[in-house]
Curated annotation (Swiss-Prot):
Gene: NUDT23
Catalytic reaction(s) noted: ADP-D-ribose + H2O = D-ribose 5-phosphate + AMP + 2 H(+); FAD + H2O = FMN + AMP + 2 H(+)
Molecular functions per Gene Ontology: ADP-ribose diphosphatase activity; FAD diphosphatase activity; metal ion binding
Sequence ranges assigned to domain Nudix hydrolase in this UniProt record: 120-243
Protein name: Nudix hydrolase 23, chloroplastic
Top-level taxon in the UniProt lineage: Eukaryota
């Protein structure tokens, strides 16, 4: 898992020019003030900042249980289903499910070689692409959330940095060549074992087109972002934080934990609280 303080001062002109290939509605809850005049919003260049202050946002739906949304409760509910691990990934032997000595969680342990299978979070990387007061979104052509809008993003692969993975995913999903400017947000989602790292980026040229995983790619004006048709809570949070920063005239780095409301539908992208929100 990336630590926020380790990536704050990161800045680069990384670009990706070669073609990469891959085998491979809701309540009216919003972070944005209703008085926000998007026509008066201007962006500023990201800055290196090394101090943080904690805040807490909530977009939980009415009637949500604050106890059920607590980090302790969510961590229990988000434990991986180790019982699905039937065989050892190293020797192929059958596994047993026990709590190893000195540990607290149930693990899959090979009955032949004795190795323990640990389940670790997956990192999702992507780009928030700015161009002349607009942001680039992709309409998904795959499940989950087929037909809904998202930032170009996907799983980080072995052998690439987070920034390289974000650029690769942008090329694969939007056919866009981008320059990464700075990290913008790290959002942990314990319930599903994912960490999102989103970078601010700019287009190297005006060419973009949907890849196999996208139905459409489009630049949206800030007041036209389809918040009622976004694919994931992480994208909903990222775009709202971005607009809030623009309103304040200063782009910042954000770290937070998205705790999904237990029992809510996976398609309900607003049933969450944003905890441990750290920002300059």
């Amino acid at each position: 898992m990336l630590k926020a303080v380790q990536i704050l001062g990161w800045s680069s002109g990384l670009t990706i020019s070669q073609r990469l290939t891959k085998t491979r509605k809701s309540s009216t809850v919003s972070f944005i003030s209703s008085s926000l005049n998007l026509s008066s919003v201007t962006s500023s260049s990201p800055r290196r900042i090394f101090s943080f202050k904690p805040t807490r946002m909530s977009s939980s739906l009415p009637g949500s249980d604050p106890v059920a949304n607590s980090p302790t409760f969510v961590s229990v509910q988000s434990a991986g289903d180790v019982r699905k691990i039937k065989f050892c990934q190293w020797c192929g032997g059958p596994t047993k499910h026990e709590i190893p000595d000195g540990e607290e969680k149930l693990r899959a342990i090979c009955t032949h070689c004795g190795k323990i299978a640990y389940q670790n979070p997956k990192m999702v990387v992507g780009c928030l692409i700015e161009h002349e007061g607009k942001v680039l979104l992709c309409k998904r052509n795959i499940q989950p959330s087929h037909g809904l809008w998202t930032l170009p993003a996907g799983y980080l692969e072995v052998g690439e940095s987070a920034a390289q993975g974000a650029m690769r995913e942008t090329w694969e999903e939007a056919g866009a060549t981008v320059e990464v400017i700075s990290p913008f947000a790290q959002l942990d989602i314990p319930l599903i074992g994912q960490t999102y790292v989103i970078f601010l980026a700019k287009l190297k040229n005006l060419h973009f087109a949907p890849g196999p995983e996208s139905l459409e790619c489009r630049l949206f004006a800030l007041d036209e972002i389809p918040f009622d048709s976004l694919a994931f809570s992480s994208i909903y949070v990222t775009l709202n934080l971005y607009l809030e920063d623009l309103k304040k005239g200063k782009l910042k780095f954000h770290y937070g934990t998205i705790n999904k409301r237990p029992g809510s539908s996976p398609s309900d992208i607003r049933a969450f609280s944003l905890d441990y929100h750290l920002q300059p």
